[in-house]
Amino acid sequence: ASETNETNELDDRFFSHYFPKPMLAQVMLDAINDVTSVSDPFGRYPMGTTAKQTPLLVGSYFMNIFGRSNRQFLAQLDPKVEPNLVQVLHLINGNYFNRKISARDGTVDLLLKSSATDEESIERLYLLAIARKPTKIEQAKALAYIKESESRRVGLEDLLWALLTSRQFYFIS
């Protein structure tokens, strides 16, 4: 089983359960770009180029914060993937995510321009961000939150932010 139980929760070897790990910076950036429908420019490369397609030397604020391999030595082929305080602060209140979430022609903007109901919009955001439909409880809470928000846009943007900063999005499991 991938989840712990009372007999294996303290095990740190023998593969008795799966240890979630965060996505690599390039993978996470590409996932965020896909979910928000907003691409990052990478120097002279055409718009739509993914982070995984770029060479290591291409500047990227996000990849610098979330860790990427600089491959200066063979021993450093893999970047550090342990979350740190700087990453957490950027997830919680960084402008990077907010700009992508509220971008013109981004996912939320496209949902607002479509004829999708709140229920359909919630389902679409869940499928985009964490690859599953919301549970009935999650659907009800999200729907109530959107209805109570100052506007539909604010409610959907907040929901997308919550999904992008969730463990289910950030960790591979």
What are these regions (language model features)?
Residues 1-135, 168-173:
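An acidic, gly/pro-interrupted, aromatic-rich
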Residues 153:
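Extended, non-catalytic substrate-recognition/exosite surfaces adjacent to catalytic cores, especially
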Residues 140-149:
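Amphipathic alpha-helical segments that form the core helices of the histone-fold
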Residues 159:
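Globin-like tetrapyrrole-binding proteins
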